[in-house]
Amino acid sequence: MRLPTARNLTQKASLNALAAALDYGARLVVGFLVTPLLVRGLGETLYGVWLVLGRATEYLTVATGRSTQALKWTLARQQHSTEVIAKRRAVGSALAVWLLFFPLVITVGSVVVWFLPTALHLPPGLIVITRIAAAILLIRLIANSLAEVPRSILEGENLGYKRMGLSAAVTIAGGGLTVLALHLETGLLGVAIASLITVLITGLLFLSVVRVNVPWSGVVKPTSDQTRKFLSLSWWFLLWRFVMMLMLASDLLILGFLESVELVTTYSLTKYFPEVLVQIVAAVVFGITPGLGGIIGSGDLKKAAMVRGEIMMLSWLIFTILGSGILLCNREFVRLWVGADHYAGALPTLLILLLMIQLILIRNDANIIDLTLVLPRKVLAGLGGALGAVVIAAILVGHFGAGIVGMVLGLLAGRAVLSFVYPIMVGRFLGTPMRSQIRAALRPALLSSGLFALTASLGVWIQLEPDVGFGAWLRLLFLFAATVGMAGLVSFTVGLSQEQRHSIAHRLSGLANSFSKRL
């Protein structure tokens, strides 16, 4: 059996980015509507517990072996290959590694389920409920690790766009299940069960999409040598997952263990709007990256360097434009959304935004390094930076009582080394010296700093009418749109060269054409 060879990487990248954007748009809308209901339905304490449980169980994904990541990037490099058996054996290897790690997941998960509630210093009446909810989330984790197999096949084959609209619909349905659980007053347990059902539906969806759209889909028993090779590769992806968990989930755990779950609630609600940046950029970048894998696999490093430049340029444009609007409007957004008492302040908002931007840039280069399948240096550097960040943040919060500001400063300082190490690693592989990277980033960085300083200052004293009705939301939306529009105009005309502006216009044109053809 021979497979058709994929040709138009730009079109697929555009469609993948669009599909990811639709998914994120659904998650954004669902989160925006459901979060206030969760805060009111669970209360400030249990909502904080729910957030910490979610972050803690995310750490357990490390124990699953992360074989699906190895599968995704292996297929990304082989997407032009017509060897069916080799691809099916890759799937078999991923499942074999998953089975090897299953006992570890159960063992470590059981320990977390039992001891986490007491570590949060919860009242005795909440201990049992929290343990049961944690157990449900452990089952969700196991189900999700299996659901990642068909998802990784789609993304590795650069066919993520084939689920366009379907996964967004499942996200909306999952939000509906959460609202139903709150309406029925099932509390923390009902919300946990709703999230489990959503994961099960998502897994079945991706499996059906793979069967329809991937001609070679199937599993072949791998050889012992292939399994060992996959296990070796998965080991580094596993460690990298741990690094990412330290970057993505350590903030809530530090505040939850060293401060209080109530402060976790305030921090997470203040962070909600800035965190949009990470997800939007991830939606764009993750849609482009598998296509970049095909370019790297073909040996065209010059073109790969050009695509990497586009990724960084688009990331900068997005976080500068939206970040300006967020700094100006976040205080009013939190006030209208969940109440002014849940706003952490202007300085924490600015620092959180900078933390999100730092994470975006680190993840961009980390994803490119993944495509080389040469992971040890990346993982070890990331582990050192992430652990250092957690230690510094924990000291500032636990010993000095610096709260949210101290925690974010600690994370920024600890991860700063990765902001230099990863670009150097990528530059060596693609032939882009660090000096030229710094030179290219200087003008955009200065422009972003100026816009952020201006909008953060204005955001301190700008206040809309004190009402919280629909009219207030419209005024806030107008203010945000006007800010984003002005920041976009300045960023596009001042921050980009003529060649970069042409490149973005070409990318947007390709996206529009791809979408119109799909319709």
Task: Tell me the role of every PLM-derived stretch.
Residues 1-13, 206-249, 253, 287, ...:
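Interhelical loop/hinge segments that connect adjacent transmembrane helices in multipass membrane
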Residues 1-31, 85-96, 127-130, 206-210, ...:
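N-terminal membrane topogenesis motif
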Residues 1-7, 424-438, 453-519:
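Membrane-proximal transmembrane or re-entrant/amphipathic helices at the cytosolic face
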Residues 9, 13, 96-249, 457:
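Hydrophobic transmembrane helix module of multi-pass membrane transport proteins
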Residues 14, 141-166, 189, 353-387, ...:
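Membrane-interface junctions at transmembrane-helix termini in multi-pass inner-membrane proteins
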Residues 15-32, 170, 194-206, 210, ...:
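Transmembrane helical elements of multi-pass membrane transporters/channels
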Residues 37-46, 161, 172-204, 376, ...:
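Membrane-interface helix-loop junctions in multi-pass transport and translocation proteins
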Residues 65-81, 155-156, 214-216, 275-316, ...:
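Helix-loop junctions and terminal segments of transmembrane helices
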